[in-house]
Amino acid sequence: MMPPWLLARTLIMALFFSCLTPGSLNPCIEVVPNITYQCMDQKLSKVPDDIPSSTKNIDLSFNPLKILKSYSFSNFSELQWLDLSRCEIETIEDKAWHGLHHLSNLILTGNPIQSFSPGSFSGLTSLENLVAVETKLASLESFPIGQLITLKKLNVAHNFIHSCKLPAYFSNLTNLVHVDLSYNYIQTITVNDLQFLRENPQVNLSLDMSLNPIDFIQDQAFQGIKLHELTLRGNFNSSNIMKTCLQNLAGLHVHRLILGEFKDERNLEIFEPSIMEGLCDVTIDEFRLTYTNDFSDDIVKFHCLANVSAMSLAGVSIKYLEDVPKHFKWQSLSIIRCQLKQFPTLDLPFLKSLTLTMNKGSISFKKVALPSLSYLDLSRNALSFSGCCSYSDLGTNSLRHLDLSFNGAIIMSANFMGLEELQHLDFQHSTLKRVTEFSAFLSLEKLLYLDISYTNTKIDFDGIFLGLTSLNTLKMAGNSFKDNTLSNVFANTTNLTFLDLSKCQLEQISWGVFDTLHRLQLLNMSHNNLLFLDSSHYNQLYSLSTLDCSFNRIETSKGILQHFPKSLAFFNLTNNSVACICEHQKFLQWVKEQKQFLVNVEQMTCATPVEMNTSLVLDFNNSTCYMYKTIISVSVVSVIVVSTVAFLIYHFYFHLILIAGCKKYSRGESIYDAFVIYSSQNEDWVRNELVKNLEEGVPRFHLCLHYRDFIPGVAIAANIIQEGFHKSRKVIVVVSRHFIQSRWCIFEYEIAQTWQFLSSRSGIIFIVLEKVEKSLLRQQVELYRLLSRNTYLEWEDNPLGRHIFWRRLKNALLDGKASNPEQTAEEEQETATWT
């Protein structure tokens, strides 16, 4: 019987191995389940057995497979793409590809294959692309691919092939369209080498012979041969050899001929114009010249290419292109990465397409005369335009495509008059000037595509897009709007399906901006400064499927979120400043409920409060809000009650003291004739004028002044009430600008009103010391009303005015004053003496 400990170990091991799935030991990476597997550089010596039979794509590159044995891939009947690059394969046995009836792409790059058997490629009945670069292949004759009747592209570059002779089995490859023989050791091309092409004129083959050290092409080697494309780049060591070889291309009919060199590999120091004379006997539809040094500016020497339909110059050191003969029948001209010092002067009646891009150096646009031009690409040149754009600039009214992107300053001076056929217009990353001063696009009713992204445009004119009734794509990212508010500029573009407003510094959206865009499908509002998500802006977008509001500062929603269009399928709200607080509970709950169309909702994080920073929005717990609401409600009610009681006590405290004082002093005599309320700014006038004339004059009055009569150690408010109001018959209010602006003076005045009401007598005398603006006076409504309805004294600093002022003031103070015989006699005596 098995010992217990041994039985336990056995069961544990059995359980462990039973949990392992077949794929758990597979070193390959599952890119697409059951479809694509990445097994690169896993030190595999054979094809893994546990890859699913349904696999269509396998990358086995950089594994030491050494030998491909028969039936190596028989388990992968659905395989379509196979990469065996640099697997050290030396031998391919017969039937190695057995069962791969659907394989269309096979890559054997970098394998030192020593020899091929006749059946090395048997079974590949659907192969279309075969790459055998760096496989030590010595000739096409020894390459057994005659049975690959579906083959379209053959790449045998960078091998040891010395002859370009196309074997007889090529007649079986009726679908072959491209053969790459570049970077081999082919030095000569003879008549017999291309006999297959001569006997099969129906073959439309592209042949790449670049980087072969060709020094001789036999006369009539290409006579009667038809090719789709012939590439001869970096083949010739001297101009004379190149000229002779090109002359021996006579009789060739080629759709596209590519000559020249490579950017980093130059054999010819000087490209002499006479070289091109060798092409006069070659029928060429399209010609391309690449990376040549010291190229002649005399384009007339291209007379052998006068009848080509397309001319292309790429990386050519040409500095001027002018005086191109009008009889040249070029329909397409491309000038890419050249070194032009000025814009080409062109007058070509047949030219339909002009591409001038990535020129090395800044140039200014010049007017051209191209009546047939329909396509114009002038992008990435640092071009400057002093005026754009109209028929007079281009000399054509057939233009449909205009690309002026990635240039310098473009001054808009016309509204495309004569260019009404335009359908595509691109200004991105150029600086547009004056584009908002008028309706620059008014004539472009047929325009379908407009890109003004990153053009330093500040949109402050709602009519900027007037006339664009057919526009379906509008890109305007990286610009700005007046007051950072998206204004109603889309009223006329009712056919828009794509609108990009990203990085426009937008903070607000005007009401009804999108209401006419019923066909809009994609709206990009990302990378702006929007604070709220307002669904009412989008409820008229009946066709909207994608809305991107990511990278804004959105904290919460505004309004009812159910207003989003039913067609909306993708909505991106990531990277916003979402506030995960109970105040925004409805918005947070809505986010949780809309997982089906919110993009990357599981990555949405909270920005505030601080304790929830970087927390996931989906983790916000709504239940805590109910508890908080109860606590907050009780707290708020308590605070309101306490605050109300405190406010009432504070507000009426002094009035209560005043009432109590009135009862206390109601039967006693007043000590003072008047209590003076004034601003400290007017104290000089009170001391030098008021006190001097009333207390030292005739009759004498006794005034209550705070700086003299208030009791030290007692609160100011208590002194005002007890010493000022309760012991005075009247109150003198000295009104001035500073008085109205002083909160303390206004407080004293309000207490005086209460005192007057409680004493049931007219005891307040107003003195307007200086002219006070009505606007300032209206700030104190009650004071303004009293001054409007009651008589007051105005101080006038002149003899007559002073005399009247003091007489009226003394009469007002005498009103209600009890008579004192001794004081009256004394005053009469002083009066007589004074008289």
Swiss-Prot record:
Membrane-related topology note: Single-pass type I membrane protein
Signal peptide range equals: 1-25
Q: Which UniProt keywords apply?
A: Cell membrane, Cell projection, Disease variant, Disulfide bond, Endosome, Glycoprotein, Immunity, Inflammatory response, Innate immunity, Leucine-rich repeat, Membrane, NAD, Receptor, Repeat, Signal, Transmembrane, Transmembrane helix, Ubl conjugation
In this UniProt entry, which cysteines form S-S bonds? 28-39, 280-304, 388-389, 580-606, 582-625
Q: What is the effect of changing residue 94 to N?
A: In strain: KK/HLJ
Question: SUPFAM superfamilies under this entry?
Answer: L domain-like, Toll/Interleukin receptor TIR domain
All ranges on the Cytoplasmic side of the membrane = 660-835
Which parts of the sequence belong to the LRRCT domain?
A: 576-627
Which residues does the annotated region (Interaction with SCIMP) include? Answer: 670-835
Indicate the impact reported for residue 637 to I.
In strain: P/J
Gene Ontology MF term list: identical protein binding; lipopolysaccharide binding; lipopolysaccharide immune receptor activity; NAD+ nucleosidase activity, cyclic ADP-ribose generating; protein heterodimerization activity; signaling receptor binding; transmembrane signaling receptor activity
Q: Which SMART domains match?
A: LRR_TYP (SM00369), LRRCT (SM00082), TIR (SM00255)
Tell me one GO biological process term: activation of NF-kappaB-inducing kinase activity
Residue intervals of the TIR domain: 670-813
LRR repeat spans: 54-75, 78-99, 102-123, 126-147, 150-171, 175-198, 204-224, 226-247, 248-269, 329-349, 350-370, 372-392, 398-420, 421-442, 446-467, 470-490, 495-516, 519-540, 543-564
Which disease is this protein implicated in?
A: The protein is encoded by the Lps locus, an important susceptibility locus, influencing the propensity to develop a disseminated Gram-negative infection.
| Record function comment | Transmembrane receptor that functions as a pattern recognition receptor recognizing pathogen- and damage-associated molecular patterns (PAMPs and DAMPs) to induce innate immune responses via downstream signaling pathways. At the plasma membrane, cooperates with LY96 to mediate the innate immune response to bacterial lipopolysaccharide (LPS). Also involved in LPS-independent inflammatory responses triggered by free fatty acids, such as palmitate, and Ni(2+). Mechanistically, acts via MYD88, TIRAP and TRAF6, leading to NF-kappa-B activation, cytokine secretion and the inflammatory response. (Microbial infection) Required for the virulence of fungus C.neoformans var. grubii serotype A (strain KN99) CPL1. Independently of Ly96/Md2, activated by CPL1 which results in a type 2 inflammation response characterized by Arg1/arginase-1 induction in interstitial macrophages.
What is the protein name given in its UniProt record? Toll-like receptor 4
Q: Which gene encodes it?
A: Tlr4
